Swiss-Prot record:
Catalytic activity: (sulfur carrier)-H + L-cysteine = (sulfur carrier)-SH + L-alanine
Organism, scientific name: Anaeromyxobacter sp. (strain K)
EC assignment: 2.8.1.7
Family membership: Belongs to the class-V pyridoxal-phosphate-dependent aminotransferase family. NifS/IscS subfamily.
The protein's assembly and partners: Homodimer. Forms a heterotetramer with IscU, interacts with other sulfur acceptors.
Gene: iscS
Protein name: Cysteine desulfurase IscS
Amino acid sequence: MKIPIYMDYHATTPVDPRVLEAMLPYFTTEYGNAASKSHAFGWKAEEAVEAAREEVAKLIGASAKEIVWTSGATESDNLAVKGAAHFYQAKGKHLVTCKTEHKAVLDSMHALERQGFEVTFLEPERDGRLDPAKVKAALRPDTILVSVMHANNETGVVHPIAEIGRIAREAGVVFHCDAVQSIGKIPFDVEAMNVDLASISAHKMYGPKGMGALYVRRKPRVRLVAEMDGGGHERGFRSGTLNVPGIVGMGKAAELARLERDAEAVRVTALRERLRKGLEKELDLLTVNGSLEHRVPGNLNVSFAYVEGEALMMAVKDVAVSSGSACTSASLEPSYVLRAMGVSEDLAHSSIRFGLGRFSTEEEVDYAIRLFGEKVRKLREMSPLYEMVKDGVDLNQIEWANPH
């Protein structure tokens, strides 16, 4: 077992060796530009790009013509949300999303608000899931877009996307789904789930970073205003010379995900449960954040009461985990996802996200259980609040002196 141990698979995944192997020739001998139509170098590159497009489409039940290459899921989210809003704004300027979306969606929505669009931000239930009835109630005649993620990046909670998609479809509203954290882990099918636009990332499924895709439905056709102007690549949706090695890597990652997903889901769920039960055996006052029933296999988001998340992370340097999402973990604000779910500020501050994946082992899980057990106990020994609770004091009944 190698130290440090990686348990942050929601932030990124290692590139699978089989993916790297598929990519390497496109850095060396096969260096053509896929847009070069007049010679064999370009034809070979284009052939590789189209084969990868087929693989990504197959993984989500789409047709290859519906896959647009991007630089990653942040770009895909921006292109979907802003592109659809700008195209359909003559019909209305109302958008609907959830408070626990990824920042790429939330900040795109805020940017649109500054341009005169109106956005309804829905609250999830206590278990982190969004009730489809709330989406239905939020729709208005001028609603043009609903954007709800499939699986949350912090809690791993899976939303009832098929039902939300059906509600949007019946209302004639475009439905975008950020499927970054679910694709390759659990089934995601654009037809069964009534999805019009879907964001996909390569580096969340053992492919390279800086590579993504956007699914854009053709029947009924969904239209977007391009965010990037240029040579008209990707049917005008996304200009710019294609990243052939990255695309080949994403295609291979999609193929492996399709072939290995179901067996891997069983294995990783077993590891997650081993971790959860082990931590619960070691420690008291442990809270799992979000639904355990509706959750991606490798996610465990836990609050260790009376322990500061940042202090705990420093104490467990040998295990790579995160408190909050990697995109926002530079700020010490409590997780906005957990706060939107109604988790108290103290518990949100003490939350740790474990992410298990393809290369995680039982040995690593057992090591993490022992390490977290030891370090949490040590930090709690320094907490007078923990001592008071153990002595039966109800902290809610105490009137604290106001220092200000």
